[in-house]
C-alpha cells in the first residue's frame, strides 16, 4: 500500500504542474460519457497511468476517461479506479478541482475496497487518504506532510445539493429546503472533490446527488467517485447511502455504472433515510 500512496503523491505533484502550465483547451477526443475531453484531462490521465505502471502491486487500472480497464501487472493484487481530474470544467474559472482514487484488492467492487484517496488542487494542494483512518496531508514544496486525522461531528452545518433543481423530486426539494430552514449554509461549487472536502474539514453536513427525472440512476460513478468517497466518509465517522442502502453494500454492473448518493454526518443521513423511506 505504501508504494501506491507514494505513486499518488507523485501524480499529485505532476498534475499540479500540469494545471499551472498546460493548455486547457478542448481536444478532438471524447471520454466514456461522450463528453469532449480537455487537453488537461488527457494529460492528467496519462500522468496517472504512467506512475501506476511502475508499481508492480497494481494489477489493473480503470480511468473515468477510458471505456475499458487496463491490465498493468498480472501478478499485482490491487485494482485502482480513478477520476484523473474531477471538475475539470471549473479550471477556466479558476475554481478548485481534484483527483479521486478507489483502491480495491483482488477485483473491483465496494466490498473489495481497502483504501481510498483524493487530492484537492486549490490555493493549496491537499490530499486525504483513508485506510484504517481518514488522514489529511498538505503539499509543502515537493513533499506531503501529515496534518491531522479527520473526524466528522454528529451534525454539520453545510448543505451541498447537486443535480438540476427542476429535475428533483418534490420530496427531495422539500428535504433540502428543510436543512436551509435549520440554518444550514449553501456550499456547492459544481466540483465533487472540493465540496465534499469542505464538508469533511468543516465537521459535517450533507452532499446530495439524487435520482432525478433526467438521470434516474444518478450521475456519479460508483467505482470512480461514489465508492471512494463512501469509504472516506465511513472511516471519518460519517455515513453514505443511496437514499436507503449503504453505498458500500451496492454492486456494480459495469465500470461506468452510476448511483444516486448522499454523503454526510449521521444526523443528516438519518434525515435522508427517513424522508426517502416515507416516499417510496
From Swiss-Prot:
Its EC number is 3.1.3.11. Its cofactor is Mg(2+). The keyword Acetylation does not apply. Mg(2+) 1 binds at residues 64, 83, 85. The keyword Ribonucleoprotein does not apply. Binds 2 magnesium ions per subunit. GO terms for cellular component: cytosol. Keywords: Carbohydrate metabolism, Cytoplasm, Hydrolase, Magnesium, Metal-binding. Mg(2+) 2 binds at residues 83, 86, 225. GO terms for molecular function: fructose 1,6-bisphosphate 1-phosphatase activity; magnesium ion binding. It is found in: Cytoplasm. Pathway: Carbohydrate biosynthesis; gluconeogenesis. It catalyses: beta-D-fructose 1,6-bisphosphate + H2O = beta-D-fructose 6-phosphate + phosphate. Substrate binds at residues 86-89, 188, 219. SUPFAM superfamilies: Carbohydrate phosphatase. InterPro entries: FBPase_C_dom, FBPase_class-1, FBPase_N, FBPtase, SBPase. One of its GO terms (biological process) is sucrose biosynthetic process. Homotetramer. Belongs to the FBPase class 1 family. This is Fructose-1,6-bisphosphatase class 1.
Amino acid at each position: 500500500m505504501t508504494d501506491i500512496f507514494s505513486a499518488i503523491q507523485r501524480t499529485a505533484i505532476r498534475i499540479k504542474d500540469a494545471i499551472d502550465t498546460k493548455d486547457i483547451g478542448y481536444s478532438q477526443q471524447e471520454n466514456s460519457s461522450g463528453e469532449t475531453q480537455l487537453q488537461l484531462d488527457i494529460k492528467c490521465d496519462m500522468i496517472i497511468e504512467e506512475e501506476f505502471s511502475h508499481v508492480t502491486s497494481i494489477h489493473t487500472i480503470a480511468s473515468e476517461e477510458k471505456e475499458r480497464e487496463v491490465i498493468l501487472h498480472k501478478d499485482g493484487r490491487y485494482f485502482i479506479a480513478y477520476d484523473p481530474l474531477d471538475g475539470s470544467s471549473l479550471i477556466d474559472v479558476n475554481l478548485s478541482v481534484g483527483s479521486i482514487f478507489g483502491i480495491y484488492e483482488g477485483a473491483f467492487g465496494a466490498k473489495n475496497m481497502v483504501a481510498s484517496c483524493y487530492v484537492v488542487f486549490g490555493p493549496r494542494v491537499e490530499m486525504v487518504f483513508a485506510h484504517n483512518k481518514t488522514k489529511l496531508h498538505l503539499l509543502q514544496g515537493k513533499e506531503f506532510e501529515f496534518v491531522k486525522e479527520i473526524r466528522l461531528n454528529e451534525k454539520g452545518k453545510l448543505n451541498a445539493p447537486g443535480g438540476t433543481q427542476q429535475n428533483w423530486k418534490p420530496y427531495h426539494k422539500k428535504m433540502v429546503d428543510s436543512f436551509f430552514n435549520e440554518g444550514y449554509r449553501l456550499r456547492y461549487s459544481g466540483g465533487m472533490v472540493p465540496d465534499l472536502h469542505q464538508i469533511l474539514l468543516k465537521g459535517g453536513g450533507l452532499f446530495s446527488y439524487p435520482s432525478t427525472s433526467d438521470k434516474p440512476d444518478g450521475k456519479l460513478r460508483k467505482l470512480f467517485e461514489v465508492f471512494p468517497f463512501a469509504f472516506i466518509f465511513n472511516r471519518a465517522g460519517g455515513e453514505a447511502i443511496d437514499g436507503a442502502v449503504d453505498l458500500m453494500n451496492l454492486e456494480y454492473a459495469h465500470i461506468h455504472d452510476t448511483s444516486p448518493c448522499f454523503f454526510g454526518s449521521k444526523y443528516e443521513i438519518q434525515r435522508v433515510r427517513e424522508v426517502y423511506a416515507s416516499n417510496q
